Regions:
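Cysteine-centric segments in proteins
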Residues: 1-83
Length: 83
């Protein structure tokens, strides 16, 4: 892969439904078993992953002080773009 390509990494996500019906991810488990806490969700929108392919709800999250995108696909699976 070149430096600009990415691939999908499907992850397990701990999420909550708020009382007003929003779905918010709280943490995810990376492929090596490491759990990453999501400090903040800064944006939620329907979008395509231009790096890895796929479409769904894109959550822009702050994880370990860095911005990351977590996608919830229409098939009810979560993925992260591997860097």
């Amino acid at each position: 892969m070149s430096g600009t390509e990415s691939s999908k990494v499907y992850v397990n996500v701990m999420a909550e439904f708020t009382k007003d019906g929003r779905l918010l991810p709280r943490s995810f488990i990376w492929k090596d078993g490491q759990v990453y806490e999501i400090q903040r969700v800064t944006d939620v929108r329907r979008a395509a992953s231009l790096k890895a392919g796929g479409v769904g709800i894109r959550y822009t999250c702050i994880v370990n002080g860095r911005e990351s995108h977590l996608f919830y696909e229409d098939n009810n699976m979560w993925f992260v773009e591997e860097r």
